[in-house]
Amino acid sequence: MTWFIDRRLNGKNKSMVNRQRFLRRYKAQIKQSISEAINKRSVTDVDSGESVSIPTEDISEPMFHQGRGGLRHRVHPGNDHFVQNDRIERPQGGGGGSGSGQGQASQDGEGQDEFVFQISKDEYLDLLFEDLALPNLKQNQQRQLTEYKTHRAGYTANGVPANISVVRSLQNSLARRTAMTAGKRRELHALEEHLAIISNSEPAQLLEEERLRKEIAELRAKIERVPFIDTFDLRYKNYEKRPDPSSQAVMFCLMDVSGSMDQSTKDMAKRFYILLYLFLSRTYKNVEVVYIRHHTQAKEVDEHEFFYSQETGGTIVSSALKLMDEVVKERYNPAQWNIYAAQASDGDNWADDSPLCHEILAKKILPVVRYYSYIEITRRAHQTLWREYEHLQSTFDNFAMQHIRDQDDIYPVFRELFHKQNATAKD
């Protein structure tokens, strides 16, 4: 009998293959749950794991069961109401719910709650940013932006059952058994030859023959005790993420912090920028980020001040665009950098300044950037800034604009702006 002993160091992940299969099978339902859950999180907690719930009917398996129709013959215990051959009225189907606490209370029926399970931070972020990429990424001369791709990387002694290499494991098993039994097999071969000689000799040497047979049996038993396969033989296909170099890139984040931006609007803008930051840091290695806050004046700030500063004032959007243009000219040569920008505002701007914003974007910024996205966060009617930007959208293919009304719009708008296109064009 062969015994398999699990000595793997990662024994706690023995069901990982089942988990991965489950995530692949119900990816659509999981992504839907994630898109709903992200809007309920705090601004500082968008990159942790998540409890995902899936409606029971979405994970129910096909099964055979007895139908409710037709005639059936059954034997029931005796009672005071029925006698032999009486027909029993068919019970009405229960009006049960399907769990999850929806609908009115009822005295009948039964159901099941939604299936809830926990996904890790890595699984959460992988699903969150799946199929997203920086648009129009160009291969420039200096390659510092690194995107990671999964490649085969030989074999490893540890892994999940789904990645086991049967051929390599059996090769190791054969080599181990050959090495461990080579000496015994040579000794066995010599004893068998000696036994053959003695068996054919005259007179018979019964005692010597019996001794040889006993030694041969012991050697064969020792050889058979060497296990056919051992945990040391197992080899798994190894995969690793290797850097896939492409062009260097910079992302400009322009946020309106004027007095018209109330705290709720600022929080939605911060949620969008945190998603953008996580997406860039998760997908690419060397993307630089330039943070610009503006009211009547624009200022380049660090990450902490961008998200937490309380400074506010009036509204002149062109101040941020002028500062961005200055920074590009000073530090980011468009011939060597892929330049991106994401601007968030409530659309409230000094009326005479909106045409100036149109002019700066059309003549200075859009000709040198790979992609510029504008997000307007408001429930009011659009004002002059939106209307000026609409003219840009019809003229420039690398300009996109979206409208966010409440938190539920943030993630769909983000995916719409950065969904993967034929984005890695090589000019």
UniProtKB/Swiss-Prot annotation:
Superkingdom, taxonomy of origin: Bacteria
Region (Disordered): 79-110
Short name of one Pfam family: DUF444
PANTHER family named among the record's database cross-references: UPF0229 PROTEIN YEAH
Biased composition (Gly residues): 92-102
Protein family per UniProt: Belongs to the UPF0229 family.
Name of the protein described by the UniProt record: UPF0229 protein YeaH
Basic and acidic residues bias locations: 79-90
Alphabetized InterPro entries for the sequence: UPF0229
Gene responsible for this protein: yeaH
